Amino acid sequence: MRTNPTTSDPAVSIREKNNLGRIAQIIGPVLDVAFPPGKMPNIYNALVVKGRDTLGQEINVTCEVQQLLGNNRVRAVAMSATEGLKRGMDVVDMGNPLSVPVGGATLGRIFNVLGEPVDNLGPVDTSTTSPIHKSAPAFIQLDTKLSIFETGIKVVDLLAPYRRGGKIGLFGGAGVGKTSLIMELINNIAKAHGGVSVFGGVGERTREGNDLYKEMKESGVINELNLAESKVALVYGQMNEPPGARMRVGLTALTMAEYFRDVNKQDVLLFIDNIFRFVQAGSEVSALLGRMPSAVGYQPTLSTEMGTLQERITSTKKGSITSIQAVYVPADDLTDPAPATTFAHLDATTVLSRGLAAKGIYPAVDPLDSTSTMLQPRIVGEEHYETAQQVKQTLQRYKELQDIIAILGLDELSEEDRLTVARARKIERFLSQPFFVAEVFTGSPGKYVGLAETIRGFKLILSGEFDSLPEQAFYLVGNIDEATAKATNLEMESKLKK
């Protein structure tokens, strides 16, 4: 641990102590820097360019060494805009990789990729920093216990339960509710588990980052009056930032989460929104560095970069990092190399469906496409497993019958199939749920549903106990008791209309 050279003003003594180079070439966010013979920086070292532009404005650009070119030159990628830089400017080799603040002082704050606070709340009250590049925990340090992480979201807990200390992927195209689901998870986990979260906004919209921050302040996840009581640290590298920043912001968030796990011995939640943008930024940097592209134009090092990040997200004997990663699926194609590479690292996948979103069923989690390695009788128990399998079988049969219904109509089905369809439609609606973070849009108060309540509700629907209730009663409710109360209200309303 050391004082952060990239976020504090380097004094003259540091400047003299460190190696000094000069900019030889600038191509967009990529800089070639010449150093004196024998004074070459290491790969991943931080370089700082300081000076003034033609208007006299101060320049302070941090870069990261990516390649050693020979002839005493290195190629570095800038972490911020390179406007105003010119050839011949001094470049200081800081002698270490980028280091960022870590610990309790980061809670309730917003940081950029360099660990600099960007929320106008003054400097971070800590001198403890940690480098963003480090090795994954040794095999002997890993913890392999299997336990469920309850989220309070019915469709997730029943059909694709999350593993404590596991990696979960949220797959979906644009506008189907990935970020809303992440916000709900942060809210539920902070309130139900009292856990600390780190949110890495990787290459997403600045407006969404701002909305998320405001939502967190309103819901109490961030306590403005006493930041130490906040439950989340935010790290943003948004769409408008250079590819270097977007490529490294995930590592900055992960470094903060690792400190809570390893030093504070806490269970941490790491949210990455969006892991596809991490791959996309890596692809841009790869092209800028002149590497030959691989399949579909992605970088040839795609698997290595993904593996380096994902292997650090793990549980050790000290604590756990449970990671929830939103994965944008280009053109809804799950075979695209970016989502396909991500799949290999995940314990559970929550796939969001445009079809369900179009029906107005939120969260639009596809119950048949979503999977989890935890859905085994020896882990979740026989009752949970059997209920989940029956729900899936009912929905699968309904899916198979939809073509027949579209052509011949519901009346042409057998009595048994008609009953299956009726129950499947109730199940489909009961899988929807009002979110706390969506209260302002829906007008319905959010609901947290425990796992036992969820299993009880679906068992009752499958048993046929509620065959007489209208399917509308099961839409956007919490537990099954709310559905029966809603059915009674609907019945009274229809009588009044008559």
UniProtKB/Swiss-Prot annotation:
GO terms for molecular function: ATP binding; ATP hydrolysis activity; proton-transporting ATP synthase activity, rotational mechanism. The modification Phosphoserine is found at S13. Its EC number is 7.1.2.2. Gene3D superfamilies: 2.40.10.170, Bovine Mitochondrial F1-atpase, Atp Synthase Beta Chain, Chain D, domain 3, P-loop containing nucleotide triphosphate hydrolases. It is found in: Plastid, Chloroplast thylakoid membrane. It comes from the Eukaryota. It catalyses: ATP + H2O + 4 H(+)(in) = ADP + phosphate + 5 H(+)(out). The keyword Ion transport applies. It holds the Pfam family ATP-synt_VA_C. The modification Phosphothreonine is found at T6. InterPro entries: AAA+_ATPase, ATP-synt_VA_C, ATP_synth_F1_bsu, ATPase_a/bsu_AS, ATPase_alpha/beta_chains, ATPase_F1/V1/A1_a/bsu_N, ATPase_F1/V1/A1_a/bsu_N_sf, ATPase_F1/V1/A1_a/bsu_nucl-bd. ATP binds at G172, G173, A174, G175, V176, G177, K178, T179. It is an enzyme of class 7 (translocase). Keywords: ATP synthesis, ATP-binding, CF(1), Chloroplast, Hydrogen ion transport, Ion transport, Membrane, Nucleotide-binding, Phosphoprotein, Plastid, Thylakoid, Translocase, Transport. GO terms for biological process: proton motive force-driven mitochondrial ATP synthesis. GO terms for cellular component: chloroplast thylakoid membrane; mitochondrion; proton-transporting ATP synthase complex. It is a peripheral membrane protein. Belongs to the ATPase alpha/beta chains family. Produces ATP from ADP in the presence of a proton gradient across the membrane. The catalytic sites are hosted primarily by the beta subunits. This is ATP synthase subunit beta, chloroplastic. It comes from Raphanus sativus (Radish). The lineage of its organism: Eukaryota, Viridiplantae, Streptophyta, Embryophyta, Tracheophyta. The gene is atpB.
